A protein has these predicted regions:
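NAD(P)H-binding glycine-rich loop region in Rossmannoid oxidoreductase-like domains
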Residues: 56-93
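SDR active-site strand-loop-helix element
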Residues: 6, 30, 72-75, 112-118, ...
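Conserved catalytic-core motifs of eukaryotic protein kinase domains, centered on the activation segment
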Residues: 39-41, 82-89, 123-127, 172-173
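Conserved Rossmann-fold NAD(P)-dependent oxidoreductase catalytic core, especially the SDR/UDP-sugar
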Residues: 74, 100-139
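C-terminal substrate-binding subdomain of Rossmann-fold SDR/epimerase-dehydratase oxidoreductases
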Residues: 190-191, 195-310
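NAD(P)-dependent short-chain dehydrogenase/reductase
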Residues: 126, 139, 147, 151-202, ...
Length: 310
């Protein structure tokens, strides 16, 4: 299959593109390389890879590279609430307008597999699992834009949307602003963290399992199409406090406490059911403890927090 991946050198794309190539697909990897990342260099030997430096909002560029592909995976995104708040215009043009443009330019036969976020659930009911039928209630611009474009995607047909849990794990284009990655980094470098809203819960998924999900969708597209799917670890609906307790099992000297004053601007608090995608045969490979162990090793290499989106 010929696949166009936008944002291909980002945190997810840097894991996904090699997996697509290993599976025999031909990949056009488009990225602006705004972080000067070299995360796809190791793939350049592969004749099935073409790398394009450019902006996913460039209509002429997208038209050109859409011509001969079977599938599009639009990863180009200003990811996370803080970054979207810093650049709301860039957030809308990248996270909404650019994806809508792909839908308008593609042929009806070309499929789209799109990563949205389970952040769209916002604040859930205590003790009630959010399913794909749960009304979306985003609490940030990032979440709202993802929810809006998902609605457009599903109405356009011939697509799958993936409501990804909070990602974690090592990637060649590393990010330390993700919660598990951040807390583990603090544990091994600072030895402590002060928590705000420590009881707020969310779901987690390893970046390699996110890549696996895209491959699963490509292989099972006909039976999965035109539906949203939650993607996360069913045994990892954890509060910040519970996450720190998991990290402490591997970093015994890690100290964490909840602040009695102040609050976290991130108000997300929900638990998620991943039963729908599991019924299609998908099963994550990497547990949260395995991911934490991986991060601890990785942070022996990374010594400064230069890997964030803001």
């Amino acid at each position: 299959m010929k696949i166009l991946v936008t944002g291909a050198a980002g945190y997810i794309g840097s894991i996904l593109v090699p997996r697509l190539l290993q599976s025999g697909h031909k990949v056009t990897a488009l990225d602006s390389f705004i972080y000067n990342q070299s995360s796809l260099l190791d793939c350049c030997y592969d004749n099935n890879l073409d790398i394009v430096r450019g902006d996913a909002r460039d209509k002429g560029l997208i038209q050109l590279y859409l011509k001969d592909v079977d599938a599009v995976i639009p990863l180009a995104c200003l990811t996370g609430a803080p970054l979207c708040d810093v650049d709301p215009v860039g957030a809308r043009t990248t996270n909404f307008d650019a994806v809508k443009m792909i839908l308008e330019l593609r042929s009806r036969e070309q499929i789209v597999i799109f990563p949205t976020t389970n952040s769209g659930y916002g604040v859930g009911q205590k003790g009630v699992y959010c399913t794909e039928e749960t009304p979306l209630n985003p609490v940030s611009l990032y979440g709202r834009l993802k929810a809006e474009i998902e609605k457009v995607l599903l109405s356009s047909g011939n697509c799958i949307t993936l409501r990804l849990a909070t990602a974690f794990g090592i990637s060649p284009r590393m990010r330390l602003d993700l919660l598990v990655n951040d807390f583990t980094y603090r544990a091994v470098t600072d030895g402590f963290v002060v928590l705000f809203e420590a009881r707020f819960k969310r779901n987690y998924i390893h970046v390699r399992d996110i890549a696996k999900t895209f491959l699963h969708c490509l292989e099972n597209f006909d039976k999965m199409k035109n539906e949203p799917y939650n993607v996360g670890l069913s045994d990892a609906n954890l509060s910040k406090m519970e996450l720190c307790e998991e990290i402490k099992k591997q970093v015994p000297g890690f100290y964490f406490t909840e602040s009695e004053i102040g609050e976290d601007p991130d108000k997300r608090d929900y638990i998620v059911s991943n039963a729908k995608i599991e019924k299609t045969g998908f099963k994550p490979d990497i547990s949260l403890p395995q991911g934490i162990a991986e991060l601890i090793k990785g942070y022996r290499v990374i010594r400064k927090n230069q890997y964030s989106n803001v």
